[in-house]
């Protein structure tokens, strides 16, 4: 009799466990917030035979009742789609530089049970801004009828003095062209590049294809917020990369990049504030 009761209990517990696994919403272990705030806004950026990562940072209706959706990535990810030629201009009667920006393919992943990638939805995007020195670029999705379902939250300005060294960070990207995956580490240091622009050093490993993705912290606002765009890793010798010494373009440089290119509204700037920032830049 005891054996029968034990067998029934085992079967019931297995059914409960199976049911819980099949329906993640009933499973408190599933990190729903992490999926929605870090994993799902990550996209694959494809150019020619290469690829990198990107992050959806804005998707809202504009005054024409059309959705404007933007993806943040690295300049070096999309640089092959910007062609600059020095050509003769009959009008100016001299050689001038002409620029052509080819469209970029952006793939958004779809998931089952939160974590299982089951395919992608392709979008075409245009390169609307880039900064070679900061290694940043902004893409605009050409589809204006649909809103991007998940958008990353940018670390806000003047709310605290963070992020700080020793904070846990999460690097998310579509490394090697695979579905996005996270790695964890610490914010390990602050530095500057040879032109004096700020950099973050993090111990969260990144690999080829992670460039253009995102670096997050869990903020005092109980939200995972983007603090940087992974751009490069340290190396020594001939091609010996150190993946856990990863350098990102920090949120301070992202803000300057967006405002310099008149996309301050992505940061929440009002139009008049954006104009004031432009005037300040012109006065310098």
Residue spans for each PLM region:
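Positively charged n-region of N-terminal signal peptides that target proteins for export
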Residues: 1-4
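Active-site-proximal beta-strands of protease catalytic cores
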Residues: 41-44, 68-74, 162-176, 202, ...
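Bacterial N-terminal signal peptides
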Residues: 8-16
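Gly/Ser-enriched beta-turn/beta-hairpin loop segments
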Residues: 33, 128-134, 145-146, 178, ...
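A conserved glycine-rich beta-strand in the N-terminal activation segment of trypsin-fold
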Residues: 30, 42-74, 245
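C-terminal cap/linker of serine protease catalytic domains
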Residues: 25-35, 82-113, 226-284
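Active-site substrate-binding loop(s) of clan PA
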Residues: 29, 33-34, 52-55, 60-62, ...
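Catalytic-histidine neighborhood of serine endopeptidases
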Residues: 59-129
């Amino acid at each position: 009799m005891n054996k029968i009761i034990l067998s029934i209990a085992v079967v019931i517990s297995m059914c409960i466990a199976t049911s819980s696994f099949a329906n993640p919403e009933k499973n408190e272990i599933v990190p729903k917030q992490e999926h929605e705030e870090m994993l799902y806004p990550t996209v694959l950026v494809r150019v020619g035979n290469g690829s990198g990562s990107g992050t959806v940072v804005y998707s809202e209706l504009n005054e024409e009742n059309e959705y404007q959706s933007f993806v943040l990535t690295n300049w070096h990810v999309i640089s092959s789609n910007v062609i600059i030629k020095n050509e003769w201009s009959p009008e100016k009667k001299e050689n001038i530089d002409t620029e052509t920006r080819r469209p970029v393919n952006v793939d958004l992943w779809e998931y089952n049970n939160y974590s299982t990638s089951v395919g992608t939805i392709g979008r075409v995007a245009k390169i609307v801004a880039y900064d070679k020195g900061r290694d940043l670029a902004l893409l605009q999705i050409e589809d204006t009828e649909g809103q991007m379902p998940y958008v990353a939250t940018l670390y806000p300005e003047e709310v605290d003095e963070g992020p700080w060294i020793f904070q846990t960070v999460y690097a998310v990207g579509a490394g090697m062209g695979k579905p996005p995956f996270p790695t964890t580490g610490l914010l390990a240091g602050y530095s500057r590049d040879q032109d004096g622009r700020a950099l973050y050093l993090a111990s969260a490993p990144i690999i080829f294809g992670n460039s253009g993705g995102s670096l997050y912290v869990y903020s005092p606002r109980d939200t995972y917020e983007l603090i940087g765009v992974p751009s490069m890793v340290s190396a020594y010798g001939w091609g010996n990369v150190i993946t856990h010494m990863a350098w990102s373009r920090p949120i301070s440089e992202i803000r300057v990049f967006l405002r310099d290119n008149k996309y301050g509204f992505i940061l929440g700037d009002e139009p008049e504030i954006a104009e004031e920032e432009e005037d300040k830049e012109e006065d310098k």
